[in-house]
Amino acid sequence: MRQLLGTLSLLGLLQCFPAVVSAQTQPASAAPSDPIEQVIAAKLMTAYPDGQFRSEQFISRAELASILVKTFKLDKRASAAKQEVISVQDVPSSHWAYNDIQTVLKTGIMKGYRGDMFFPNQKINRAEALSIFAQAHGVFQFPNDTVAKILAKYPDSGNIPDWAKKSMATALYEGFANTDEQGNINPLNPMTRGDMAYALSKFLERQEAPAPLLEEDLPSPASLPIQ
């Protein structure tokens, strides 16, 4: 009887071992894999007070300015320390994004309109937003044939304005731009919060694993559908 009890006790202990090993091999914490979760965790974007992210809502120019300042620490750049205030008629000092708008203007990352207008509430299309994002990140000085090779991978790249092609090539090369199921960039569509979350999540990933700067390693289009 004593031998039987000992055997049963040993079997019970052995059954516990896999659970213990499994618990020990689980990572203490895992980085969020969803783009929205990533950018919220990084405090680059926030959900609304009701807890919704509203990924299909359009990004405004003021929101883009605020996101860029936080992401690329534009306020730490030497040009942001200029003492003179840039006159912007439609952005009073009481505006929630006043400081960020001053920063993107002083650093030259974003431009005003008609001299002294910013249009902070105006939505911005994907070509503009991704090009500006690439400017803040740093545009690769690809030769024209490399730019053409990158853009040729996307069926609707002909819709990208000429002024944005080099910046868009950087954004696409770095994987910042999501595409629809056909691989289209949709450069003239409004930039959404979901699009921006995707770009930011890829930027965060690039901090850990930079893209190879080799022409033969040009990436395929990102396959995440556009929000």
Language-model features and meaning:
Residues R2-S33, T46-A62, V69-Y98, T107, ...:
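Feature responds to low-complexity, polar/acidic, surface-exposed segments characteristic
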Residues A169-A171:
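Intrinsically disordered, low-complexity, charge-dense segments enriched in Lys/Arg
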Residues T192-A199:
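C-terminal/domain-terminus segments
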